Amino acid sequence: MLSDIEIARAATLKPITEIAGRLNIPDESVLSYGHTIAKLDGEYLNSLSSKPRGKLVLVSAITPTPAGEGKTTTTVGLGDAFNRIGKKAVICLREPSLGPCFGVKGGAAGGGYAQVVPMERINLHFTGDFHAITSAHDLLAAMIDNHVHWGNEPVMDRNSITFRRVIDMNDRMLRNMVIGLGGKANGYPREGGFDISVASEVMAILCLASDLKDLRSRLERIIIGEDNDHNPVAAAKIKAAGAMTALLKDALQPNLVQTLEGNPALIHGGPFANIAHGCNSLIATKAALHLGDIAITEAGFGADLGAEKFFDIKCRQANLEPDAVVLVATIRALKMHGGVALADLKNENIAALETGFANLARHAENLAKFGVKTVVAINRFHSDTEAELDKLQDLCASIGLDSAVCTHFTDGGAGAEDLARKLSAILDAPKEDSFRLLYPDEMPLWKKIETIAKEIYRAGEVVPQGTVLKKLKSFEEQGFGDLPVCIAKTQSSFSADPKAKNAPTGHIFPIREVRLNAGAGFIVAISGNIMTMPGLPRHPAAENIDINEDNEIIGLA
């Protein structure tokens, strides 16, 4: 089989105006970035709010393993499948980050015959949204230190500055540093550091803002530190929000591309789900709901991270109600959760599959707590045996879950038609249950953290470390007690220990740090050793990326 990039390069892409035309978007609202990429005019999208809203489908997954699950691939394949059976579907994805693109994961445009294209441009730079977000974030960082340097009012406590710089790259050397060395002319010495851009509060703000006015208001609310009387200082106090908004004006408009089968895809925003809220932009999701019959979106990593944050943060803030969830699983990953080594996954192992099924069942139980109907998408690999596939479908049925074997990676949308039809039956039928959130706004912050950790991660005890409880009390006293919680933890386990596979229960779940993201509208609670600035692996994917003799990019997967 051809590589992802070879498949993408062989495709004949339609003009982006033709893709927009299928959604009845007028030409003057299509802001082209070449022939195959466009941004959609924000004013036009605002005008859609009075139109009927379609159905919302979330694609999530079991706990990820190195064996791979194929969540983005399934999202793309499902969108193509819906369109093949006569449903007007629009998919919504996050934009790839350069960090993982050159690190472990590689690109994030799907795979095989279920991709969004042009994949090279989408994976590398795209329309410059991440550059704009990084620039706006670091402009605020520069203005903070400049404000302190000149002693402007309000006078800030330089040791209280909480706003770090960002870059869209995996670089462990930038995590912690001393800045401002070299004498008074070069600033003032203090500890600082960088996070990856996808962990930026500005990224989260762009993805949760409803329009440009809301974006500016949220930027003003970013807490950057304290004054000398220990009162919180917001970005509005140093007059940074206006220039930041100017940098983000175009980036706020969602990007329109196409799948290999010529169906519309909105790709916009890119917060990670392990260190941020993990969902594409609200503006893109709402646009898809008004432009199509069905909007299909994905949330990062496993359902314990992406889906919970999609429900409790994005849906809470935007008053959205999902109509169905797809839980993506693979035989390979479930066998790995059942104790099989990566090198042995090609061998049939029914016993390990049965053991690892506990992970899928746990995610399904958690999703049921939100009142949303779930269908399992079994993303088939060539090494899967018929006996294993039959066993997994039987296991799903035994706990009341419908499932569909999907081959969209090799067959495109045709390979996900069974999944699309099963979802259509759910979407067309009256709801059996009502959507609900995991906790109410008025619940105390620590109780919210405990609720997520015990109800979703199945922790036995949640342990606050250091000044966590003191900070949470301070946040509540400052009027932020009604905010939802975004827990940053490893994506590799329900617990804080990435080595604890399958479905651990009764574990100790530590909270080592909490951060206030007042602009984004949530509290970040950091657990375990999760880093907001990743590092590169021993042999990063960047080693395999190059330009060939025809000036074409190679090695991008």
Curated annotation (Swiss-Prot):
Pathway where it operates: One-carbon metabolism; tetrahydrofolate interconversion
EC number: 6.3.4.3
Superkingdom as given in the UniProt entry: Bacteria
Keyword ATP-binding attached: yes
Keyword Membrane carried by entry: no
Binding site for ATP: T65, P66, A67, G68, E69, G70, K71, T72
InterPro entries associated with the record: Formate_THF_ligase, Formate_THF_ligase_CS, P-loop_NTPase
Catalytic activity of the protein: (6S)-5,6,7,8-tetrahydrofolate + formate + ATP = (6R)-10-formyltetrahydrofolate + ADP + phosphate
Signal peptide bounds: none
Gene Ontology BP, a term: tetrahydrofolate interconversion
GO MF: ATP binding; formate-tetrahydrofolate ligase activity
Gene3D superfamilies for this protein: Domain 2, N(10)-formyltetrahydrofolate synthetase (3.30.1510.10), Formyltetrahydrofolate synthetase, domain 3 (3.10.410.10), P-loop containing nucleotide triphosphate hydrolases (3.40.50.300)
Alphabetized UniProt keyword annotations: ATP-binding, Ligase, Nucleotide-binding, One-carbon metabolism
Protein family according to the UniProt entry: Belongs to the formate--tetrahydrofolate ligase family.
Protein name in the entry: Formate--tetrahydrofolate ligase
Organism lineage: Bacteria, Pseudomonadati, Pseudomonadota, Alphaproteobacteria, Sphingomonadales
Name of encoding gene: fhs
